[in-house]
Amino acid sequence: YFSYNDKVIKILEAEYLNTIHHVTAGTVISDKLEIACGSGILQVKKLQQESKKALNVEEFLRGTNILKATILK
């Protein structure tokens, strides 16, 4: 899970990509909600904002604008 705009968002489905990057862990590195991890990239597929229904990443991003280079915690 991560927090964004004071809301908890659960990652329900994701794929790990074993890709080298040079950014801080937690940084959004693409418009498709790919997040840098310690030693790779987490490609988010499905998530759920608190008190909302589960959505695939495309549906979620239509209503929530998480910009590239945002650092998630």
UniProtKB/Swiss-Prot annotation:
CDD domains, sorted: Met_tRNA_FMT_C
UniProt enzyme class: transferase
Alphabetized GO MF terms: methionyl-tRNA formyltransferase activity
The keyword Protein biosynthesis is annotated on this UniProt entry: yes
One Pfam short name: Formyl_trans_C
InterPro entries: Formyl_trans_C, Formyl_trans_C_sf, Formyl_transferase-like_C_sf, Met-tRNA-FMT_C
E.C. number(s) listed in UniProt: 2.1.2.9
SUPFAM superfamilies given in the database record: FMT C-terminal domain-like
Keyword Plastid in record: no
Function according to Swiss-Prot or TrEMBL: Attaches a formyl group to the free amino group of methionyl-tRNA(fMet). The formyl group appears to play a dual role in the initiator identity of N-formylmethionyl-tRNA by promoting its recognition by IF2 and preventing the misappropriation of this tRNA by the elongation apparatus.
Similarity section: Belongs to the Fmt family.
Descriptive protein name: Methionyl-tRNA formyltransferase
Gene: fmt
